[in-house]
Amino acid sequence: METKAIIAALLMVTAANADKICIGYQSTNSTETVDTLTESNVPVTHTKELLHTEHNGMLCATDLGHPLILDTCTIEGLIYGNPSCDILLGGKEWSYIVERSSAVNGMCYPGNVENLEELRSLFSSAKSYKRIQIFPDKTWNVTYSGTSRACSNSFYRSMRWLTHKSNSYPFQNAHYTNNERENILFMWGIHHPPTDTEQTDLYKNADTTTSVTTEDINRTFKPVIGPRPLVNGQQGRIDYYWSVLKPGQTLRIRSNGNLIAPWYGHVLTGESHGRILKTDLNNGNCVVQCQTEKGGLNTTLPFHNISKYAFGNCPKYVGVKSLKLPVGLRNVPAVSSRGLFGAIAGFIEGGWPGLVAGWYGFQHSNDQGVGMAADKGSTQKAIDKITSKVNNIIDKMNKQYEVIDHEFNELEARLNMINNKIDDQIQDIWAYNAELLVLLENQKTLDEHDANVNNLYNKVKRALGSNAVEDGNGCFELYHKCDDQCMETIRNGTYDRQKYQEESRLERQKIEGVKLESEGTYKILTIYSTVASSLVLAMGFAAFLFWAMSNGSCRCNICI
């Protein structure tokens, strides 16, 4: 037994005296986690947040200028000239338009605006408007000053309500040619009285017809007389219409009653963000690259989660709370009890908290002490690849959005309006694509890190060959003495295996000899213990027989 203890102690001393080099990666006290396709909340040493989550809670100017805030008016109230919106008549510029939730000044006389959403989209897409007179009052040889209690005993500033003059309403014929360089938005209406009496009181003609024509439209209207529910004190209705007169085109109108005639039109110029925000946010003294109904934001990140209705130079909307990309390694806490090396570990069980200037590296122990160094080559390649991943994600998302925007910009205004209506679906699709793309890249990144450490380990293994033995924890125990200069050659790939081959062979034989001697001793001890045990059993059995025969409990008969 003493021999066995001596041999075991010898093996321990031999192992403890061996110079050692380990391959591993950086470990930190980071609490950052990322998600991949197959795992959630994977601990990593470093992350890059790709999602912007903050805004300033204000309405701000953008690179296209300041917003147009309508206060108590709606866009259609501005366009048709609700008398309560006179403050806006002078012409305005905007980067986007803001409607308040408390806006009440829209169409004062009850009725419907045909293609209202398209009208709002058309008007808001321009950058400015200028009022231009289409038909002067002298155009009409009937009364043109009709008013309504519903419109504060006044009427729209862009249209004239024509009624009889001296009990006569002859056919009115008017035409206007657009000599401007821009399109002109013009508006008209058809009045539907609640009774036949009101029809003749206003227009004298019981049966009227109105036609409105340009090179693009040819519309004919007849009133539908009859009472409707009381709205704004009125049982009558006005159907509101609009169209665009292009440069060089001529507008022709013919009517013998019920016409709400064009008076002023709007010359629309430039392009804005084309957005209408319905919000009560305060107007701030600020400039942002991206605006939402919740507030403005400035960021260089590729994604945000503020609002899918963002516009301007905005990152892409993703409806998640966080979208992180690992720019480091899997963060496996260092093992505290690692014998010779203390709180370090190889690539199998954990990372090194002391590793600096790199992600992958080496730690060694020899007669000169313990040292640690990063493998800067493999680290730099990994960093470059991750930087490329971030840029690629941004480029991929930008290209996909640009393709869609370009396709819709080539189509007509009606399809642009449809584009706005399906914008939610487009945003949701690309938000899903963005999340999936990041999950894929995260999976690849972490798999690549594991492969990088494994490749570094195998590189050292090939270099050392039979001059070292693996300990199973990412380390190699050298069969020869290896000072710091020798360790550096292992790290930089210039290790000369032949230089240390003879020393390693002798040390290996020495260790193997101890093992052989130990095995021989174990065999002798085994045989000795087996024989000794057998003798003890035999002597015990003989003593039992002798005792039993002496007291008569056992008798032996021999028959011949």
UniProtKB/Swiss-Prot annotation:
Disulfide bonds join C22-C475, C60-C286, C73-C85, C108-C151, C290-C314, C482-C486. One of its GO terms (molecular function) is host cell surface receptor binding. Residues 19-526 are extracellular. The chain crosses the membrane at residues 527-547. Keywords: Clathrin- and caveolin-independent endocytosis of virus by host, Clathrin-mediated endocytosis of virus by host, Disulfide bond, Fusion of virus membrane with host endosomal membrane, Fusion of virus membrane with host membrane, Glycoprotein, Hemagglutinin, Host cell membrane, Host membrane, Host-virus interaction, Lipoprotein, Membrane, Palmitate, Signal, Transmembrane, Transmembrane helix, Viral attachment to host cell, Viral envelope protein, Viral penetration into host cytoplasm, Virion, Virus endocytosis by host, Virus entry into host cell. Residues 548-560 are cytoplasmic. Homotrimer of disulfide-linked HA1-HA2. Belongs to the influenza viruses hemagglutinin family. Binds to sialic acid-containing receptors on the cell surface, bringing about the attachment of the virus particle to the cell. This attachment induces virion internalization of about two third of the virus particles through clathrin-dependent endocytosis and about one third through a clathrin- and caveolin-independent pathway. Plays a major role in the determination of host range restriction and virulence. Class I viral fusion protein. Binds to sialic acid-containing receptors on the cell surface, bringing about the attachment of the virus particle to the cell. This attachment induces virion internalization either through clathrin-dependent endocytosis or through clathrin- and caveolin-independent pathway. Plays a major role in the determination of host range restriction and virulence. Class I viral fusion protein. Responsible for penetration of the virus into the cell cytoplasm by mediating the fusion of the membrane of the endocytosed virus particle with the endosomal membrane. Major glycoprotein, comprises over 80% of the envelope proteins present in virus particle. The extent of infection into host organism is determined by HA. Influenza viruses bud from the apical surface of polarized epithelial cells (e.g. bronchial epithelial cells) into lumen of lungs and are therefore usually pneumotropic. The reason is that HA is cleaved by tryptase clara which is restricted to lungs. However, HAs of H5 and H7 pantropic avian viruses subtypes can be cleaved by furin and subtilisin-type enzymes, allowing the virus to grow in other organs than lungs. The record marks R338, G339 as: Cleavage. This is Hemagglutinin. It is a single-pass type I membrane protein. The keyword Calcium does not apply. Glycans are attached at N29, N141, N218, N298, N305, N492. It is found in: Virion membrane; Host apical cell membrane. A lipid is attached at C556, C559 (S-palmitoyl cysteine). It comes from the Viruses.
